[in-house]
């Protein structure tokens, strides 16, 4: 895809995402807004938008994981900064844990089972965990009744409404996607969607 076409597509996707969020926020503003309660319908829209975003991220993270040569999985830009495999395994862990539990779903692994994941550097194992982590998040989030998402939940030490939660989780994952894109470009790895 030519760069100009990619930019237009990216802007269009961002505009659609912002429109969905704006529409959701407008739908949630009602007489109940003083109580910070969303409607079930609004919660369903936010949940669907988050699932769609997770699917886009899944494709990009797995695409980058496949594009990186195995010998670059331990590469890091400097000491004290996550390596390629550590970023990928963090995202796998978020699929197993933070993404579904932030919305009330169940974790796919216990904390004890997740602890050693940051040490996995084998390309095939990393891709396997990414695939399983995203699949778990999707399955759990799809199973959540939107009616349970209308109020606030305690996430990251704060009471948060659903839009705040999905922005926090999605924002964190997108931040790491950007980090991984920078790692890829630094190592002359072209993101598959940019070819």
Say what each PLM segment does.
Residues 35-49, 94-158, 187-195:
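Short, helix-capping/interhelical loops that line the mouth of catalytic, cofactor-
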Residues 1-11:
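N-terminal secretory signal peptides that target proteins for export/translocation
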Residues 30-34:
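Sec/Tat signal peptide C-region and signal peptidase I cleavage site
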Residues 15-29:
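Bacterial N-terminal signal peptides
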Residues 51-55, 59-62, 72-114, 154-195:
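Short, contiguous alpha-helical
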């Amino acid at each position: 895809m030519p760069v100009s076409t990619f930019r237009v597509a990216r802007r269009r996707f961002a505009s659609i995402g912002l429109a969905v969020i704006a529409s959701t926020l407008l739908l949630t503003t009602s007489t109940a807004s003083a109580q910070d309660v969303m409607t079930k319908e609004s919660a369903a829209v936010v949940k669907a938008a988050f699932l769609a975003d997770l699917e886009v991220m899944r494709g990009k993270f797995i695409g980058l994981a496949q594009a990186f040569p195995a010998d670059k999985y331990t590469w890091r830009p400097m000491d004290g900064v996550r390596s390629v495999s550590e970023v990928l395994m963090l995202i796998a862990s978020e699929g197993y844990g933070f993404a579904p539990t932030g919305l009330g779903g169940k974790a796919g692994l216990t904390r004890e089972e997740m602890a050693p994941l940051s040490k996995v550097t084998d390309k095939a194992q990393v891709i396997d965990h990414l695939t399983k982590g995203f699949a778990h998040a999707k399955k759990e989030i799809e199973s959540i009744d939107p009616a349970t998402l209308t109020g606030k939940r305690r996430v990251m030490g704060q009471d948060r409404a659903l839009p705040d939660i999905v922005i926090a989780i999605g924002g964190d994952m997108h931040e790491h996607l950007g980090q991984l894109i920078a790692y890829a470009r630094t190592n002359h790895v072209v993101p598959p969607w940019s070819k």
